[in-house]
Amino acid sequence: MKNILLTLLLLSPLAFAEDTSEYQRITPKELKIQDNLERTILDYSTSDELGMNQMLAPIGWTEPIVSLEFELRGVVIAGVLGLEFKEETAKFNVNEGFVIPKNTKVRIHNAGNVPLHLVEILRPGYKESLVKEFESFE
């Protein structure tokens, strides 16, 4: 018991020490992507393991049907997100989160009548080679 207490006392200051050299300010890369309409991605990613984006899409925007070789999670900041799958279409409103599992066929679109604003987390981070486009859900 004394050894455990001694270990905790010695490790506690180390475990809670703040190393300010690890903090960083991230300036996003702005990407313009042309689907049926142009959308904007603000990419805050700092590694290939994890992507972090803001996505801004106009009214009427839609992607083609895709299968993503990464998990996509996010939250709707403004507008209505539509996720179209083979059997159904799900809609997500402001302050609702969503998860698109890896390798799921989906068409992502703005399902509302105002611009769509999302914050997205991708695991692993985005690479063009990890996105496959399809003509249909079959």
Describe the function of each predicted region:
Residues E88-K102:
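Short acidic-glycine-tyrosine-enriched beta hairpin
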Residues S47, K102-E128:
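Ligand-binding loop in jelly-roll beta-barrel domains
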